[in-house]
Amino acid sequence: MAKEWGYADHNGPDHWHELFPNAKGENQSPIELNTKEISHDPSLKPWTASYDPGSAKTILNNGKTCRVVFDDTYDRSMLRGGPLAAPYRLRQFHLHWGSSDDHGSEHSVDGVKYAAELHLVHWNSKYNSYATALKHADGIAVVGVFLKIGREKGEFQLLLDALDKIKTKGKEAPFNNFNPSCLFPACRDYWTYHGSFTTPPCEECIVWLLLKEPITVSSDQIAKLRTLYSSAENEPPVPLVRNWRPPQPIKGRIVKASFK
């Protein structure tokens, strides 16, 4: 069987390029954001998300993260504006976290790592399918939200309560009537740059919108993510305690801010 990628020493991010050459590409994500080097771009517009809660379908443990999947067969849950020239359809969201609360996010801001990072993945509906969108530099838009430790967040708990149904790799459960807008911070300011998926095959097709303001969740809530397993039900248990990729070289890319 082909070696499967993961986050352990033997198959982790340092090895991904052996199977997925993109991982050593020129436009890889995540990156370290150094705010002193980021300039305000006054042409960047506000972004809007109009999500249909009825488009949420299932929640899945794929052995790498927990993912909530949406119906993207038509323009139903949409992201518009910001740096985007077209509307993008929400396909899924997932999370990255660490083994303790002092790290776990993939992007960092002036050296600060957050406890977790939420990624909402959308595809440009001018392309006739998600698979086609992956082949274009403007094919995918990901909204990244940082999670910091503080007060419990009730909306986040709705997601966490479903994790008991998907403890092990390969498990999937219904997850309906959820509007992910409830996980956005009040402030919509963002940084944007061109990058890649942070998991193999690491395709370089992503317009990133990283929200400046984190949302707050409790330490107990983040701990619940670590109760998932990267192993299947019939395998020796392997806890899914960390699933973040370290920062990648920026290689001359420009990061812009929507705010002063």
UniProtKB/Swiss-Prot annotation:
Inhibited by acetazolamide. The modification S-glutathionyl cysteine is found at C182, C187. Its EC number is 4.2.1.1. Disulfide bonds: none annotated. The modification Phosphotyrosine is found at Y127. CDD domains: alpha_CA_I_II_III_XIII. It is an enzyme of class 4 (lyase). It catalyses: hydrogencarbonate + H(+) = CO2 + H2O. Residues 64-67 are annotated as: Involved in proton transfer. Keywords: Acetylation, Cytoplasm, Glutathionylation, Lyase, Metal-binding, Phosphoprotein, Zinc. The modification Phosphothreonine is found at T73, T216. The modification Phosphoserine is found at S29, S43, S50, S55, S219. This is Carbonic anhydrase 3. The lineage of its organism: Eukaryota, Metazoa, Chordata, Craniata, Vertebrata.
